């Protein structure tokens, strides 16, 4: 018999085999393990503090005071010292969990949950102890949060359960499981319902992105199919029209045919298929949310948390912590609400001001790019300026994300909500609002204002002497596409790289710090780690080994899961709001999410400390946020198609001004469209000659001195007033927007009505469950009455 087979004879539990494999991997002793009986003495939480030798130091006194307060609540404290760190292992008394179970049973909203019927899991123990720790105050009135801020304690964390952690790593948190299903029930048991619902929602969102991504690719291929044969592209590429200079100082006239490539790219995203796709995505967003509600209802019903109330559980935890506690009453102050409203408004004005700064950057960058010696950049100065603006926008987003978080937390402190759940809802709404304005203010400018407020030759609009940007003759939609593509690609790619590499590098660097201790521990484990009853009771070295393993993982906090939700909801916004300008957005989101699920799983199960398991029955206020995004998507896409794209002007030209409008059947209906959208500026006009006063500005590449040039607008060639065609196009634009939004909104309401939130099976299961529960209560009452008699 080989050595490995002999060793396996001693493995009575999966935990033993896991431990032996880890010891062999780390170079520990491979001597056989003794059969083990799992210990019942688990640690619920660990506090870490810096070692203070001076007993009179304020930090040492506060540490002792806090530990004494915990001991008064019958929490067992195990103190271990390692180098300059002091570890406090905390274990709550069984009575606290019995009180919790009883209060759940008599609760109005929580009495139907699974915890009220079964035993207390380790996840529940952690949640209870976490609450007790944060609600424990020392004689100075400070709680744990304030002690952590004052460096009395360095950190706090709950411990990973090694056996369950390894099982999750094997089934879920690995790259080889990229295209397999998620063990949501196992995630729920280990990380709690809140984390499980995040992965359930993310998996559902990713699954429903498949049809959206497929249709987006079809729309893109539709534009690609007519890439070279479209008459509008031919008109641009074969044109000899001379266009007016794009800027004041360094730009000269140019030929429309110079932008042939730009016109082709514009047609990829600005075509007839875009309208149908935008309508589909608006209805898709509604169906996604309605089907998600059904999917959620099925799982929370199985988990027995359908009627769970977080605020009520918080009241129960308050009583468990202090039977004489008083509830934190609901309060409303008009002064506080007004102050918060003013501060939010000021913050939004600051964010919009940053968007204006980005506009100024592009206005200044475009003429500067036209001065460089590199011909490629010089010829595509406007496009390069847009791309640089998008990169700068991304940098602004990264900076403002931290500012927005700090401001949102401070505003929540001003509001003084009565529960953590209420604080979380308030923080979510504020943070998302700030992030939304940070991300989309610049995009809204590009979509709805770029090229519409810049004026015309002889009367240009300027900022500090710099002319505002103009739209390309083929339309402004490509600028919006470039802006979205750069931000979305940078945000998703770089964020995922940093999300994974930073915790991984920290874990690798810290892993060697406890190597000596772990090797020493490898020789004593399972032999000396036994109590008098023969149960496995880790020695101090084994405890330190486990605590250090968790201590060296990346830190987590109450808003760690919020960050993941925010990232995905922002992506959902990009996927739906301006999808008319970027049909490939759902495809990029789908590819990103396939990796995002495993990336987040690997982070949580391998690289980060264990999140505090939270019990809930929904994704919370995020549902309302997603519904608001769905409504905004209808409005934004209607405006993008009706106002930003050339769909309506092309439609008007086809049926009112084009060859087909006059009954001609020999020419293409769109022949002459590009020329129809251009107006002419003559140098004989005094105001125009003043704008183009440099001699070099009106000289073409062939050396010809141009006496007139064209620009994109519907204006008279004599007095530059708006033509009747402009007003007709504008009227049709508004009519289209109103019609589009009403049709899509009706479709959304029909879809929401047609798909009920709760499946019939869930309703029936809950009915039978409640009936069985009531019958059980009745039998217990009769049994108690007969016992009394």
Each language-model region and where it sits:
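Intrinsically disordered cytosolic tails
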Residues: 2-789
